[in-house]
Amino acid sequence: MLQTRLGLGALRQGRLLFAVKSFSTTSVAKIFPPPPQTIKGTVNDAAVFPHHSKLHGSYHWDFERIIAIAMVPQVMIPLFTGTSHPLMDAALACTLITHAHLGFESCVIDYFPARRFKKLSPLMHWILRGCTVLTLIGVYEFNTNDIGLTEGIKKLWKS
Amino acid sequence: MFATRSFCLSSSLFRPAAQLLRPAGRSTLRNVWRRSIATEHLTQTEANSRLASQRVHRPNSPHLTIYEPQLTWYLSSLHRITGCVVAGTLYAFAMGYLVAPLAGYSLDTATISGLIQQVPTWIKVPAKFVISYPLTFHIFNGIRHLIWDTTKELSLKGVYRTGYAVLALSVLTSGYFAMI
């Protein structure tokens, strides 16, 4: 790669024609310090396309929509009619925690991108998975040893 | 007659112009085309390191601070925030229910209900509104997004119509829940 460099003679002769301007005219506002700048390969390397998988594409989208649509009656029926049943509580717990996990996963993907946070991003994903497992166990314990999710919220709300 | 006029025109037009242009043109060309430029050869590693050092100083593109406040992206941000609030509450309570007996406490319904009964009513009614509003907003905005997934109401007028409907429905529903 050839890098051009202007000599002093050119600067002296073409001072009026080639005035040097700064790259930016406003103060640089940085949110985070820039990450270590690593350039992979050269400009002549072939482009690498991301792995194509339906499990991360349309199947994932369908699964998210199925969970969301299944949650609508499971949330609306106890919320507006007050009826409750242990099996309904169990189904609500499964879909609700799955929906919450998918939402938190989107937040982790957006706010801890793997390209920038090479170690923190997998750690956050595993922390989320651990919390989801603990939440499933906790809600199961609450549904079996206490009066259940729907009755519990109703009792707390009307106390 | 014609021969005499052409001879006079040629002599009067071209000889002074040539005299005027010749020294000025030469000096201008000499000044313009003479440049002293030196080039240096860089290895791939040196070029990459120089590019990396230049990229460190690139400014951020302007983003949240320059966008006009609009219902569209405000509701979208609020959807994620309310979802995190409701899901975070569920996660915190479930994990607390598991961990509390290790510290000698108990988070069962009877204990919490007894604590809530000691709070006066004039605090509980607005508190119920604040607690239930993230849930109701998230429910109705989620239904709004499911409506969009069927490619309905995706015009700008439809987006604003459903947005105002979500706001009205969530406020009314939370108000009803606060009064129970």
UniProtKB/Swiss-Prot annotation, chain A:
GO terms under cellular component: mitochondrial inner membrane; mitochondrion; respiratory chain complex II (succinate dehydrogenase); TIM22 mitochondrial import inner membrane insertion complex
Cited Gene3D superfamilies: Fumarate reductase/succinate dehydrogenase, transmembrane subunit
Listed transmembrane segments: 66-82, 90-109, 123-140
Stored Pfam families: CybS (PF05328)
Mitochondrial matrix topology ranges: 31-65, 110-122
Binding site for a ubiquinone: Y111
Keywords, ordered alphabetically: Electron transport, Heme, Iron, Membrane, Metal-binding, Mitochondrion, Mitochondrion inner membrane, Transit peptide, Transmembrane, Transmembrane helix, Transport, Tricarboxylic acid cycle
Membrane topology: Multi-pass membrane protein
GO biological process: mitochondrial electron transport, succinate to ubiquinone; protein insertion into mitochondrial inner membrane; tricarboxylic acid cycle
Protein's name in the database: Succinate dehydrogenase [ubiquinone] cytochrome b small subunit, mitochondrial
Species of origin: Schizosaccharomyces pombe (strain 972 / ATCC 24843) (Fission yeast)
Gene field: sdh4
Curated annotation (Swiss-Prot), chain B:
Signal peptide start and end residues: none
CDD domains with a match to the protein in the record: SQR_TypeC_SdhC
Keywords associated with the record: Electron transport, Heme, Iron, Membrane, Metal-binding, Mitochondrion, Mitochondrion inner membrane, Transit peptide, Transmembrane, Transmembrane helix, Transport, Tricarboxylic acid cycle
Names of required cofactors: heme
Pfam families per UniProt: Sdh_cyt
Example of a GO cellular component annotation carried by this entry: respiratory chain complex II (succinate dehydrogenase)
Matches recorded under SUPFAM superfamilies: Fumarate reductase respiratory complex transmembrane subunits (SSF81343)
Topology relative to the membrane: Multi-pass membrane protein
Example of a GO MF term: electron transfer activity
Gene Ontology BP terms: mitochondrial electron transport, succinate to ubiquinone; reductive tricarboxylic acid cycle; tricarboxylic acid cycle
Translocase listed as a keyword: no
Localization (cell): Mitochondrion inner membrane
Mitochondrial intermembrane side: 104-122
Similarity comment: family membership: Belongs to the cytochrome b560 family.
Record note on quaternary structure: Forms part of complex II containing four subunits: a 70 kDa flavoprotein (FP), a 27 kDa iron-sulfur protein (IP), a cytochrome B and a membrane-anchoring protein.
Protein name: Succinate dehydrogenase cytochrome B subunit, mitochondrial
